[in-house]
Amino acid sequence: MTDLPPADAPVDPELDAAEIEGDESQSEAGGPDESTWRRFDVTSEAGEGLAAAQAAIAAGECIVLPTDTVYGIGSDAFSAASVQRLLDAKERGRDMPPPVLVAEVGMFEALADEIPSHAMRLAQAYWPGALTLIVQAQPHLRMDLGETRGTIAVRVPDHDFTRDLLRRTGPLAVSSANVSGKPSSTNIDDAVGQLGNRVQVYLDGGATPGETPSTIIDFVSTSLGKVVRQGALSLELIHEVAPFVEGIESPEESATLADASEPAGTDPVEAASDAPDEGVDA
């Protein structure tokens, strides 16, 4: 991979907010008109891609980024307008709030309130990785992700480029890079085809491992933990670290549990791991 510039490197001055905003048509349903978005290969154009993505996030725009599960669409988690832009791009309501991706466990501790011991053990064991943890958010946290009811879903992705980006931008609200009800994107062309000029910067990391999303564990309804979506991290591995986490017996139960609890990032439709055509969070 091309050497990455230091995390405190200045943003390219040519990528100012006025240029990033581009055509207002990006806020409407639009096709992949490349005049309003830019694409970067994260291997051969790592530095340029990081700078462009950082500038887009700072300007309140959306980006598409690779993860270790599926491609995600991301925006500034601390900007309500940016999160709404993400939801609009996905044609998704505020009742389906996106999870938050962070670069390291320390940021999880900063965002969450009184993390249960089992949750912290899982984070330390399986992050970076395909595990999303739902916990109570800090009461004074200035995030408006949607109807979270005081919860937050957090993950550290196992993708070097994306974690480096997160160190520069801070926490990002990230959902799967697809229109709700459409297949998840496992390559950048899938994402471009669905989201087009609703996104300012596309970061091409090649094909993802597949359509299986992260496993989601709810630590709000019980401090011991309950799986509300079975994804890439198996229950067997979870039980090696936290043996009392409650599993699920079927994808149908996964959707039912998510519907009943509805904490951040567990949309009842998008939670079902056997229904990739409904779209799933990264």
Give the ranges of each region predicted by the language model.
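Active-site-adjacent structural elements in enzyme catalytic cores
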Residues: 2-282
